[in-house]
Amino acid sequence: MAMGSYLSIITLNVNGLNAPTKRQRLAEWIQKQDPYICCLQETHLKTGDTYRLKVKGWKKIFHANWDQKKAGVTILVSDKLDFKTKAVKRDKEGHYIMIKGSIQEEDITIINIYAPNIGAPQYVRQMLTSMKGEINNNTIIVGDFNTPFTSMVRSTKQKTNKETQTLNDTIDQLDLIDIYRTFHPKTMNFTFFSSAHRTFSNIDNIL
């Protein structure tokens, strides 16, 4: 696969993978979608249980987990992709993982994020700032940011707060681009429904 063509990536908040039937359904879904890379958030797998996640045709599986059944992120790389791993950085509480490698001798960095429910904009901003030396034109950042970037991605049209605006400024300073919003600037699609507030929002992104 040449980087000059395309790289298909899917991302999904799985909300726990401790049930065997759920892991099986996920494996079937990944095989049906057939991407090159799959990023998962909220796996809720403890460090000693990560071996339970298996997908045929996907031997390269990278996890970041906590010692409790909380958070947890995973990056799976398809066997059909000639990916050579160079470095892996894991958050000890399972909120992000970064893998650095190459595809046909072209460097690539993939960061998968699951931001905490409380203080998500500040968390993501601080994480991106701490990693700015690792971020370049071949960096892809994927995940559940737990915060809408703009009022366009809220069903209530609630005004963007100061913390989120500061995060947006950091994203701009790092020359990161919201891929979906770039191609669909006026589309109102949502990835999350809050039953408590009866609102829809888009909190899952690829930069």
Describe each PLM feature range.
Residues 1-207:
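A shared catalytic/ligand-binding motif for oxyanion handling
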